[in-house]
Swiss-Prot record:
GO molecular function: GTP binding; GTPase activity; ribosomal small subunit binding; small ribosomal subunit rRNA binding
Signal peptide: none
Cellular location(s): Cytoplasm; Cell inner membrane
Region (G2): 41-45
GO biological process: ribosomal small subunit assembly
UniProt region (G1), positions on chain: 15-22
GO cellular component terms, semicolon-separated: cytosol; plasma membrane
Membrane topology according to the record: Peripheral membrane protein
Region described as G3: 62-65
Chain ranges of the KH type-2 domain: 206-283
Record note on quaternary structure: Monomer.
Gene: era
HAMAP family: GTPase_Era
Lineage: Bacteria, Pseudomonadati, Pseudomonadota, Gammaproteobacteria, Enterobacterales
Protein name: GTPase Era
Amino acid sequence: MSEEKSYCGFVAIVGRPNVGKSTLLNKLLGQKISITSRKAQTTRHRIVGIHTEGPYQAIYVDTPGLHMEEKRAINRLMNKAASSSIGDVELVIFVVEGTRWTQDDEMVLNKLRDAKAPVILAVNKVDNVQDKAELLPHLQFLASQMNFLDIVPISAETGTNVDTIAAIVRKHLPEAIHHFPEDYITDRSQRFMASEIIREKLMRFLGAELPYSVTVEIERFVTNERGGYDINGLILVEREGQKKMVIGNKGAKIKTIGIEARKDMQDMFEAPVHLELWVKVKSGWADDERALRSLGYVDDL
């Protein structure tokens, strides 16, 4: 009896900031793994999400959004991470937003024209397009930009046509042995995922108040005698005023962030979590490449 063939390959999800790349990854995996918020630049590392279905294993790389501004060290590193993801994959999903087309979209497209991998164009947030008559001419405009493998209008938020993307991915995976066991959904450590969950809550609850000068270090991540985890998170900001903002009036803001982060961690780790958070000022970290390296921003470039 012949052994069943297996298929496996890397798939990069690329696009300018805030077009819904992380939401799409979470939908493709069937669970939350990459952080999502309405602010641009929420994804700072390349997250590998793994989806195994029978003989097919797709390994998704969720890149930071490519964008024009490279003034700060952190933005330069994020662009480098996104560009390097494009180079070594079997397939690329290029995510754009509705009928919007910007200079940043153009920049991503130019990088993709040089890439060897076939590109699926996912036109996200089509449910938000007010005038549906604009959609068809825009899709025709997109089709003329490059020879895409396929163009799929989707809503990552509601899941519309995400199964179509998944089917195209499966069809184009090369024959290969699986890189990961079938129950793996990410190659990232639980410690890393804990820091991402806290960072998402910071983005969500502080909104536009807080600039991108915030990051999270997990100082302690241990199993306790109750079969759960004790986690200590350190939130780093650049200025004293930002520290007050994170803590909130009588500690209300950081308490909310902690409660919501703990819920998500318990769902993800399937165990009770005791979480403690502190806030510390570390000025200039987003401008300093050495500081970024020490915080793990460059470990995967």
